[in-house]
């Protein structure tokens, strides 16, 4: 991880930038309308759109894609259409503005907090398109919409600066899967095609990050109960279950939620090549009574604590 740490340190602002400075880069953003402290926002290195979001990307049949069986993909299924979004691509783009089942969605992945969320882009009668600000808050991706140039916290789906301050995007059900499991479940599914952008796809620029002692560019409190900050947790609303706990039992049924775990999926934030990352397994989350899939995410513990400070830690007995 030394190479990426050095590179990011060279670009990251040592102190939190203030709104007057940002106004030069963002002249159309209303910085007087905010719900967060500007001191919480740092530069992550690349500037506005330095990490380019994907717009209306191409897809290919799952049967035609040459991906490693155990590499991770984000899965979205809407109105009978299933699409997979390989982390090998989202690692370098973080946002894909697209449609699934006729629904305009933003498929998002924040490497530094391991948050993968899918949002409905429709809000107040318009369809929003999202880009990457290049800013981080509590090490979490800050997005912006191109229609109003408001800033959004990816972890919460909430507008935090500008005309959309306080607005909230609808989060849609998605999950992280191994490529082989996606193909088995959706043999007629589609997968995001390799973008026509010069990036080292398949590699992880944050080598060793998920075994680091501390998160990068994080200024908030550490998790309680001596939980390692980069431990993965399954977040369902304001509740968090430790992945380590789930791996020991492979299934947890608790508080109205059923969570399952199965081995066979690589960590995208371990080794330099994603397909060689250690096996962290894949999880699914359901309503314990109806069996319906639930909105959830698998995130780092520090990020859950930062963005859900009143959250419940489901530690078991």
Describe these PLM feature segments.
Residues 17-317:
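Mid-to-C-terminal functional-domain signal that highlights helix-capping/loop sites
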Residues 1-4:
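Positively charged n-region of N-terminal signal peptides that target proteins for export
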Residues 12-14:
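N-terminal signal peptide c-region/cleavage motif recognized by signal peptidases
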């Amino acid at each position: 991880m030394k190479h990426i740490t050095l590179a990011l340190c060279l670009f990251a602002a040592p102190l939190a930038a203030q709104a007057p400075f940002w106004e030069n880069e963002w002249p159309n953003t209303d910085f007087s309308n905010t719900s967060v402290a500007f001191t919480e926002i740092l530069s992550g290195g690349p500037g506005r759109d330095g990490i380019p979001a994907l717009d209306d990307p191409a897809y290919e049949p799952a049967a035609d894609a040459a991906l490693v069986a155990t590499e991770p993909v984000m899965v979205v299924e809407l109105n009978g259409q299933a699409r997979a979004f390989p982390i090998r691509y989202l690692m370098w783009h973080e946002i894909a503005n697209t449609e699934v089942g006729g629904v305009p969605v933003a498929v998002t992945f924040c490497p530094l907090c391991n948050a993968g969320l899918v949002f409905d882009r429709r809000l107040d009668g318009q369809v929003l398109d999202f880009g990457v600000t290049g800013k981080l808050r509590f090490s979490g991706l800050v997005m912006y919409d191109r229609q109003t140039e408001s800033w959004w916290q990816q972890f919460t789906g909430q507008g935090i600066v500008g005309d959309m301050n306080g607005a909230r995007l609808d989060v849609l059900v998605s999950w992280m899967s191994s490529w082989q499991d996606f193909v088995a479940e959706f043999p007629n599914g589609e997968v995001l095609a390799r973008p026509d952008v010069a990036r080292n796809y398949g590699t992880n620029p944050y080598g060793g990050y998920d075994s680091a002692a501390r998160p990068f560019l994080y200024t908030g409190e550490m998790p309680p109960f001596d939980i390692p900050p980069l431990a993965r947790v399954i977040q369902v609303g304001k509740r968090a279950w430790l992945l380590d706990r789930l791996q020991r039992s492979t299934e947890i049924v608790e508080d109205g939620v059923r969570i399952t775990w199965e081995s066979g999926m690589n960590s995208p934030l371990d080794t330099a090549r994603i397909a060689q990352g250690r096996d962290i397994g894949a999880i699914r989350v359901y309503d314990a009574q109806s069996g319906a899939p639930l909105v959830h995410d698998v995130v780092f513990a520090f990020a859950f604590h930062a963005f859900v400070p009143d959250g419940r830690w489901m530690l078991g007995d």
